[in-house]
Design a protein with these regions (language model features):
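Amphipathic alpha-helical segments at domain termini/boundaries
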Residues: 1-34, 132, 176-247
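Conserved CoA-thioester-binding segment of acyl-CoA-metabolizing enzymes
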Residues: 1-73, 109
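Hydrophobic/aromatic residues within transmembrane alpha-helices
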Residues: 72, 84, 133-134, 196
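A glycine- and small-aliphatic-rich helix-loop capping segment at beta-alpha/alpha-beta transitions
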Residues: 86-93, 132, 137-143, 168-170
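Glycine-rich beta-to-alpha active-site loop
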Residues: 111-159, 183-190
Length: 247
């Protein structure tokens, strides 16, 4: 299957930098991947086919560095505002659409299944594929000013990069229906950071002023065992049937 290209895609780059964790009380280095479309505050970062390929390569390159952990974050105030829909008209056949979906799936799956711990620092707005990127990481911090949503249903889509399967297991089927369906159909209501934290979509919340520093310290605490994250697997919750009926 050939690569799909959006001629008008505003391409998001994925740059890697390493941070020595010794100052934070852990061994090794943290490879931080920053995704950025280079347009500062004038346009939120979005994720088209080339952008996803860039993230995929960055994950591979970061893994090859053999760091103690890998983290993904965004440019100031933005993680990612979802898939780039500007080029959706080029998807004129099923194979092209399948390519876009599978490329996102396979890229995000690397974060879920990585033997190196993966973290997402949700430093700002996370919508759609941006939220799914965060959910695919094994640990998440969120800035107190961030807003989070899965708005796909509002435009007749579903969270196609695994959010629809990850979120119910993470926060329970009833809560997932609220986030995926009810919020989308209620004028695209977004979750505030503290709401996402309460639901279990994030592990820690920090203020923007020292968000990155505290997020790195959180990574170190997880790695050295000072911080234990306990999660419930909602796969067998009794309210699956009622949640499916509501959906």
């Amino acid at each position: 299957m050939s690569e799909v290209i959006y001629a008008d895609e505003v391409v998001t780059t994925a740059l890697i930098r390493e941070v020595d964790l010794s100052a934070f009380g852990a061994k090794g280095k943290l490879a931080i991947i920053t995704i950025d479309n280079g347009m500062d505050h004038t346009r939120p970062t979005t994720l088209g086919p080339q952008s996803i390929r860039n993230i995929n390569k960055a994950i591979d390159d970061a893994t090859a560095l053999n760091p103690a952990a890998i983290a993904i974050t965004g440019k100031p105030f933005i993680l990612a505002a979802g898939a780039d829909l500007s080029g959706i008209t080029v998807l004129t056949n099923a194979d092209d659409a399948k390519y876009v979906i599978e490329t996102g799936h396979s890229t995000y799956a690397k974060l879920r299944h990585s033997k190196i711990p993966t973290f997402c620092f949700v430093n700002g707005l996370a919508l759609g594929g941006g939220t799914e990127l965060a959910l695919s990481c094994q640990y998440r911090t969120v800035a107190s000013t961030a807003y989070i949503a899965l708005p796909e249903v509002f435009i007749g889509l579903i969270p196609g990069w695994s959010g629809v399967t990850i979120l119910p297991k993470m926060i329970g089927p009833t809560n997932a229906v609220k986030v995926i369906l009810q919020n989308s159909l209620n004028n695209n209501t977004m979750l505030k950071a503290k709401e996402a934290l309460a639901l279990g979509m994030a592990d820690e919340m920090f203020e923007p002023v020292d968000f990155l520093e505290k997020s790195v310290a959180f990574v170190a605490a997880v790695l050295n065992g000072a911080k234990k994250i306990e999660r419930k697997d909602h796969s067998n919750d009794p309210d699956w049937d009622s949640a499916l009926a509501a959906g």
